[in-house]
Amino acid sequence: MDIIFYHPTFDTQWWIEALRKAIPQARVRAWKSGDNDSADYALAWHPPVEMLAGRDLKAVFALGAGVDSILSKLQAHPEMLKPSVPLFRLEDTGMGEQMQEYAVSQVLHWFRRFDDYRIQQNSSHWQPLPEYHREDFTIGILGAGVLGSKVAQSLQTWRFPLRCWSRTRKSWPGVQSFAGWEELSAFLSQCRVLINLLPNTPETVGIINQQLLEKLPDGAYLLNLARGVHVVEDDLLAALDSGKVKGAMLDVFNREPLPPESPLWQHPRVTITPHVAAITRPAEAVEYISRTIAQLEKGERVCGQVDRARGY
């Protein structure tokens, strides 16, 4: 069994050694331009077209929760990956826990009005504020996949009203489910906090725009943990300036790194983190990949395969 590996920023040598230890029967090598030798599996992040094109692979693993970098290249270069080759993403590998930590900490930050107290502190102003009430602090999760379900589970502990929206209806205990475009407005109407965990597909690009933001309650909060292309940044800034949106916590952006001249950096109601809400944990990723390859070799059904038409 031959496995090729490519990631532009990961410690390649660590991954090669870890994969060899986890799959001792495999010959694992770092892929470099010009390497056209045979391979059974490819593990990659933002792979060049040359890496995958023309290969009779058993499967490709994207080294992250999203596969948009591969699917976008496939649109321009359909020869990059044969339709018969299954494409897998890392379904969790520790990312769910990280998303839970990030979402819960920020929701509580807003619920306890720490954002308002920070602004008061900046002007040396001492003024206790009225507390928010849980029953009026509905949290909506936009995108009800694996990570969305993890976030919902963690927020249930805090007894907030929860709702989710996705393409198909979900049956999550304690979570009100909305499905399809025809129910999006009703979903948004009560979301005091909107948490975006949508996949990156042609249908979801620019979904968080002026029209969507206007359907939120006045003074809502936005937490974007998915992709920067989901948000029309000028529309968000306008909503923040008007007070329609009271605050935004943004981990992802249309351009990354976020340019120094972006007005998001200096906006008093915006908090920025550099795409760190959930990062791939190498040891857990290697365990998932080795387990999945073993299942594929046995002809077993496995989780995490991407529907190329849907984009996730």
From Swiss-Prot:
PROSITE patterns: D_2_HYDROXYACID_DH_3. It catalyses: glycolate + NADP(+) = glyoxylate + NADPH + H(+); (R)-glycerate + NAD(+) = 3-hydroxypyruvate + NADH + H(+); (R)-glycerate + NADP(+) = 3-hydroxypyruvate + NADPH + H(+). Transmembrane segments: none annotated. It is an enzyme of class 1 (oxidoreductase). Its main location: cytoplasm. One of its GO terms (molecular function) is hydroxypyruvate reductase (NADPH) activity. The active site is at residues 227, 275. Disulfide bonds: none annotated. It is found in: Cytoplasm. One of its GO terms (cellular component) is cytosol. SUPFAM superfamilies: NAD(P)-binding Rossmann-fold domains (SSF51735). Its EC number is 1.1.1.79, 1.1.1.81. It comes from the Bacteria. Catalyzes the NADPH-dependent reduction of glyoxylate and hydroxypyruvate into glycolate and glycerate, respectively. PANTHER family: 2-HACID_DH_C DOMAIN-CONTAINING PROTEIN, D-ISOMER SPECIFIC 2-HYDROXYACID DEHYDROGENASE NAD-BINDING DOMAIN-CONTAINING PROTEIN. Belongs to the D-isomer specific 2-hydroxyacid dehydrogenase family. GhrA subfamily. This is Glyoxylate/hydroxypyruvate reductase A. It comes from Escherichia coli O157:H7. The gene is ghrA.
